[in-house]
Design a protein with these regions (language model features):
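Short, highly charged, low-complexity non-transmembrane loops/tails of multi-pass membrane proteins
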Residues: 268-300
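Structural signature of hydrophobic alpha-helical transmembrane segments
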Residues: 42-52, 80-94, 186-195
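Generic multipass alpha-helical transmembrane bundles of integral membrane proteins
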Residues: 120-121, 129-240
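Juxtamembrane/interface segments at transmembrane-helix termini
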Residues: 162, 209-210, 240-244, 260-277
Length: 300
């Protein structure tokens, strides 16, 4: 186990020396994956669906804050929607407008969460985002997670329905707008997942804040289990047939990543914890002190 802590210390030391380069490298990779995923799912305008375009946009986004990546991703989706029909563009633009009203008001600094959520869905481990946010952030991160979830399901619907939305009269366009909005916001699976993510986030956040041994590990495992249970109950109640294999393995993968996050952000030695008591003129204080695990890296 000590070797893991040594590796952690070396990685943290390396990051502290090259943090600017590391942050930009991570941002670039995330941007490339985001633009590639958009083009792969809703790349209806062939000119912009090229990997070269995704690479160029990622390079541009790397020199700006993460929010610019979100804005460029939004613009790319809207252009692809325009190539399908005006109806697709109008509904998608309205959905983005609603999300940005809430997003910019509550979570303007959580752009990376909005980007990571659809990517996590594509990698079949969506619950890793709410679990990670609950460990490292506050429950308000659920707003950003919700925005990313809506974007994923919106793209998933358009990937299937785009061929039926092209062309048509003004009357037909109005019908397409209503159908598109209905299919997105009345998607039972979307609402089941959103509820599961909200409950999972609250459970993980509440448990990891408790003064109990191995709070983070318990929180991660509980969050993964809660996600499986809530989605399963929702599927049965709403008549949605989800892939339980993907759900279980995705939750296990998310739990593993959660434990890795604990190693880097909350490594403590519970065997050396102490309960302290002291007082001042007004209060008695009962404090539980748990020392951090710190190891010295061997010199080469």
């Amino acid at each position: 186990m000590d070797s893991l802590y040594v590796i952690r210390e070396r990685m943290q030391d390396l990051y502290s020396r090259y943090s600017i380069v590391a942050d930009k490298a991570i941002q670039f990779v995330l941007a490339v994956m985001t633009f590639y995923m958009i083009n792969n799912n809703v790349g209806f305008m062939k000119t912009l669906a090229s990997p070269v375009v995704a690479l160029a946009l990622a390079i541009i986004a790397t020199f700006f804050p993460p929010i610019i990546t979100v804005i460029l991703a939004t613009a790319l989706i809207l252009v692809h929607m325009y190539s399908v029909s005006i109806a697709a563009l109008v509904v998608t633009a309205l959905i983005f407008l609603i999300m940005y009203i809430f997003y910019l008001r509550f979570t303007p600094k959580m752009a990376i969460v909005v980007l990571l959520t659809p990517l996590a869905f594509a990698l079949k481990i969506p619950v890793v985002v709410p679990i990670s946010c609950a460990l490292l952030m506050s429950p308000i991160s659920m707003v950003a997670v919700g925005c990313g979830t809506v974007v994923y399901y919106m793209m998933a619907y358009m990937k299937k329905a785009a061929s039926g939305m092209q062309g048509g009269s003004v009357k037909g366009m109005m019908g397409q707008i209503g159908k598109y909005a209905k299919q997105v916001f009345q998607n039972k699976e979307l609402w089941i997942v959103l509820v599961a993510f909200i409950i999972c986030t609250l459970v993980v956040y509440t448990l990891r804040k408790q003064a109990i041994a191995h709070a983070w590990t318990i929180a991660v495992i509980a969050g993964a289990v809660v996600n499986i249970v809530v989605v399963a109950i929702g599927d049965v109640a709403m008549g949605v047939h989800a892939s339980y294999g993907s759900l279980i393995f995705g939750s296990i993968g998310a739990a593993v990543i959660g434990v890795i996050l604990e190693l880097f952000f909350f490594s403590v030695d519970y065997s050396r914890s102490e309960n302290l008591q002291y007082e001042d003129d007004e209060y008695y204080y009962y404090v539980k002190a748990v020392p951090k695990i710190v190891v010295s890296t061997p010199e080469k």
